[in-house]
Amino acid sequence: MAKSIQVKLVRSPIGRPEKHRKVLQALGLTRLNKTVNLHATPAVAGAVKKVIHMVEVKEL
């Protein structure tokens, strides 16, 4: 696994369960097309896995 990953929000959280919105907020994804660089830890990987249908992930 890469040391860091780039995550971009590409699908709107409107109409999604509250749990998914909280995960996105915890990852720092507050707006559409916002990109964040995160360390690739097991906790971050699990959070990204929960919202993988709403984000794009790139390994850095």
From Swiss-Prot:
Which example biological process does GO assign this protein?
A: translation
Q: Which GO terms describe its cellular component?
A: cytosolic large ribosomal subunit
Keyword Ribonucleoprotein among UniProt keywords: yes
Q: Does the keyword Ribonucleoprotein apply?
A: yes
Tell me which UniProt keywords the record has, alphabetically. Ribonucleoprotein, Ribosomal protein
UniProt-recorded Gene Ontology molecular function terms: structural constituent of ribosome
SUPFAM superfamilies (alphabetical): Ribosomal protein L30p/L7e (SSF55129)
Pfam families attached to this UniProt entry: Ribosomal_L30
Question: Which protein family is it in?
Answer: Belongs to the universal ribosomal protein uL30 family.
Q: Quaternary form? A: Part of the 50S ribosomal subunit.
The protein depicted here goes by the name: Large ribosomal subunit protein uL30
Which species expresses this protein natively? Syntrophobacter fumaroxidans (strain DSM 10017 / MPOB)
Q: Which gene encodes it?
A: rpmD
